[in-house]
């Protein structure tokens, strides 16, 4: 966690990954939400690897490791294995912070089983990361061939949460956040129609600030200065101008989503529902659990 970033943020999510680099309850106490990173859609089961050449004094200070040391994260939490283990730490976080939400980030694999694990660990929210999401560095075979694609993963997650009695309007609702390949307002709207209560973006955000999609994040040679520690390249990123572009992207996205909500007859974005969505592709309709738009082959549950 960068202290200056957290200090200027009123809604900061603390994500705890398996290596716990720089973790302390003092830092968590300054945040507004906390979640365990149990998986990432683009590199499930592989942990993390930050080359030593990227570990500058600033990064070393934040992570609590020597400058120039390669940082390797294990695939799983070494000291947390069962839902009870995670719940114990989650309760400690709530006690220290006065009860901030505690969640789980899950890659879209064994969706229902993983959600059950998170619920048993007392999750207040779930971030579901489907195939299609970005990563700075992962083997292509992982990025392109693992994880359930985001749309069917979202549909399954929404259905399962509702069946567990923790859906919207329940006594203890669990918030469903989705991410993974969602880039533009139309994607965000469709995700909310399928039951997501929030959408998280990363690739779209870095594109808004100038990413060219060169896919050189792991090389330390990002030509626009975003994913590099080389000072000659970092100087190419004009922070204030990039921040303005990012603000414009989010504001324009929210505006267009509001336009779509009004067109669907809703007074607010949370009014989106599956009935707002249809597909003329039979396979997509089946995967997403929405109405098929064709004139033939419509089942009884697809009328409308």
Model-assigned labels for residue ranges:
Residues 9-21, 146-150, 218-225, 288-296:
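Short, structured secondary-structure boundary patches
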Residues 4-9, 121, 125, 129, ...:
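Terminal amphipathic helices with adjacent charged low-complexity linkers/tails
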Residues 237-304:
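C-terminal extensions of enzymes
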Residues 1-92, 96-119:
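Active-site-facing alpha/beta catalytic cores
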Residues 60, 64-67, 77, 82, ...:
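Short capping/connector residues at structural and topological boundaries
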Residues 74-234:
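Glycine-rich phosphate/ribose-binding loops and adjacent secondary-structure elements
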């Amino acid at each position: 966690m960068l202290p200056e970033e957290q200090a200027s943020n009123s809604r900061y999510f603390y994500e705890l990954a398996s290596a716990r680099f720089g973790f302390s309850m003092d830092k968590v106490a300054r945040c507004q939400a906390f979640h365990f990173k149990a998986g990432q859609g683009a590199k499930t089961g592989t942990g993390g690897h930050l080359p030593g050449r990227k570990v500058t004094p600033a990064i070393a200070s934040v992570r609590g490791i020597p400058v120039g040391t390669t940082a390797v994260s294990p695939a799983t939490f070494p000291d947390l294995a069962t839902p009870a283990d995670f719940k114990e730490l989650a309760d400690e976080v709530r006690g220290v912070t006065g009860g901030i939400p505690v969640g789980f980030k899950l890659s879209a694999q064994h969706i229902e089983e993983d959600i059950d694990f998170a619920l048993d660990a007392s999750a207040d929210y779930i971030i579901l990361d489907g195939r299609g999401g970005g990563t700075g560095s992962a083997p292509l075979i992982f990025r392109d061939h693992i994880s359930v694609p985001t749309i069917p993963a979202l549909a399954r997650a929404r259905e399962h949460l509702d069946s567990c009695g923790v859906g919207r309007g329940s006594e203890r609702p669990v918030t469903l956040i989705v991410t993974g390949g969602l880039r533009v307002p139309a994607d965000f709207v469709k995700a909310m129609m399928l039951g997501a209560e929030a959408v998280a973006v990363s690739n779209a955000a870095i594109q808004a600030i100038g990413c060219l999609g060169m896919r050189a994040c792991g090389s330390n040679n990002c030509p626009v200065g975003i994913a590099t520690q080389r000072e000659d390249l970092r100087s190419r990123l004009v922070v204030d101008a990039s921040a303005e572009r990012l603000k414009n992207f989010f504001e324009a996205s929210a505006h267009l989503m509001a336009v779509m909500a009004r067109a669907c007859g809703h007074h607010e974005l949370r009014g989106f529902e599956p009935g707002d969505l249809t597909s003329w592709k039979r396979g997509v309709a089946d995967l997403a659990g929405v109405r098929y738009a064709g004139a033939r082959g419509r089942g009884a549950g697809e009328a409308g």
